[in-house]
C-alpha cells in the first residue's frame, strides 16, 4: 500500500509547535516561500522559450553580473514575502540595501528574510542546475516600527529557519527550523511540494571534493596542499558552479565543498548572510560541519555589513575536521 503523500503545507502545519513562537507566522512565511519557488521553477523551465536568458547588463553590489532571471526571481520572492504580511523586511544579494516593508504589508511582521534569489544563475543559459537560498530570523527591533539594519546582521546561530530550492531534473525544496532537515520534491501533476526525503543526514565521509580548481594557484599554500591531498587520495572532483547544487550532492553522497579565500578576495567570495549562514544551518542540522578557512564556525561569525563575504569549508563532519587539522598542521610548520 502506498504511503500517504504529505505536502509541504501539511508538513509545515504539523510541525508548527516545533517553533519557539508558535503563532502561525513562520508557518505562513515558509508556505509563501514555497509559492515563490513554484513560480520561479515555472520560469526556469521556460527560460529557453521566453526572453529571460542572458545578462541584464548590470552588476550587483558585489560586482557580479546580473542575469535576467536573477531579477525575475528576486522580484517574485519579494512580492510573495511582502504580500504575506508576516515579514517586516528582506535583504537580497541583488539589492544594495535591505528593503523594509511598510506597516500596511507587515502587520504581523516579526521576521526578516535574507536570500540569494538565484544561486548559480550564470549556469541557466546552458541548462545547468540553479537554486534559491533563504534564511529567516526573528526581528530584534520593536515590532511597531520598521525593520532596521540590526535585524539583518544577526549571527547565523540566530536563524529560526533556512532552506534552499534546487531547480534541476526535478525541483526540490530542503529546509530546517532547527529540528532536523527534510526535503520536498515538486510534483508537477498536482503543483505541490511533497515530502520525499525525511530526516536527511549527511554521511560522515564521502568520496568527493568540490572546489573551483581554476583558482588553484590563487589559494594559500596550505589550501593547495590540502587539495593535492584530496587528489592523491583519489577523491573525485565535482564542481558545478552553483553552491546549492554542489552542497545538495554532498548532503546525500558525502564530501566537502570548498570556497577558499584568494589574493583577490582575502575574505572569501561567497556572501556570509545570503549563502554561507543558511547553507551552514542546513548542513549542521543534517550532522555536517561548516567553517571558514581561517577555522571559525560560520554561524558564529559577526556580521558587520549586509554583503559581507566569507570563505567556507562545508560538508561531511569527518572531512571538515580532517581539512581543519591538515591546514593547522601545515600552518604551524610554516611558523
Question: Which sequence ranges carry the predicted segments?
Answer:
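IMPase-like, lithium-sensitive Mg2+-dependent phosphomonoesterase catalytic core
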Residues: 1-51, 58-59, 71-335
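Alpha-helical scaffold segments that form or flank carboxylate-/histidine-based iron centers
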Residues: 64-67
Amino acid at each position: 500500500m502506498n504511503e500517504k503523500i504529505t505536502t509541504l503545507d501539511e508538513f509545515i502545519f504539523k510541525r508548527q509547535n516545533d517553533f519557539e513562537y508558535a503563532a502561525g507566522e513562520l508557518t505562513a512565511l515558509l508556505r509563501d516561500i514555497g509559492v515563490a519557488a513554484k513560480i520561479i521553477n515555472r520560469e526556469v523551465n521556460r527560460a529557453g522559450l521566453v526572453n529571460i536568458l542572458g545578462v541584464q547588463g548590470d552588476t550587483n553590489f558585489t560586482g557580479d553580473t546580473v542575469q535576467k532571471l536573477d531579477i525575475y526571481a528576486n522580484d517574485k520572492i519579494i512580492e510573495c514575502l511582502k504580500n504575506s504580511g508576516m515579514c517586516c523586511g528582506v535583504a537580497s544579494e541583488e539589492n544594495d540595501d535591505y528593503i523594509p516593508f511598510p506597516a500596511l504589508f507587515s502587520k504581523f511582521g516579526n521576521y526578516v528574510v535574507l536570500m540569494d534569489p538565484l544561486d548559480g544563475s550564470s549556469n541557466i543559459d546552458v541548462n545547468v542546475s540553479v537554486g534559491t537560498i533563504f534564511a529567516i530570523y526573528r526581528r530584534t527591533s520593536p515590532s511597531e516600527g520598521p525593520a532596521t539594519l540590526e535585524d539583518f546582521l544577526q549571527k547565523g546561530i540566530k536563524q529560526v529557519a533556512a532552506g534552499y530550492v534546487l531547480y534541476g531534473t526535478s525541483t526540490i525544496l530542503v529546509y530546517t527550523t532547527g529540528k532536523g532537515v527534510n526535503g520536498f520534491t515538486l510534483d508537477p501533476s498536482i503543483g505541490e511540494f511533497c515530502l520525499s526525503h525525511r530526516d536527511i543526514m549527511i554521511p560522515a565521509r564521502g568520496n568527493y571534493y568540490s572546489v573551483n580548481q581554476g583558482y588553484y594557484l590563487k589559494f594559500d599554500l596550505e589550501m593547495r596542499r590540502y587539495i593535492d591531498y584530496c587528489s592523491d587520495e583519489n577523491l573525485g572532483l565535482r564542481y558545478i558552479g552553483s553552491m546549492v547544487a554542489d552542497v545538495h550532492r554532498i548532503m546525500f553522497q558525502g564530501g566537502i565543498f570548498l570556497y577558499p579565500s584568494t589574493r583577490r578576495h582575502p575574505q572569501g567570495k561567497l556572501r556570509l548572510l545570503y549563502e554561507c549562514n543558511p547553507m551552514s544551518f542546513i548542513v549542521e542540522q543534517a550532522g555536517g560541519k561548516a567553517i571558514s578557512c581561517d577555522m571559525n564556525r560560520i554561524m558564529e561569525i559577526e556580521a558587520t555589513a549586509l554583503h559581507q563575504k566569507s570563505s567556507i569549508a562545508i560538508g561531511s563532519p569527518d572531512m571538515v575536521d580532517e581539512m581543519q587539522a591538515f591546514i593547522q598542521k601545515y600552518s604551524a610548520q610554516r611558523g
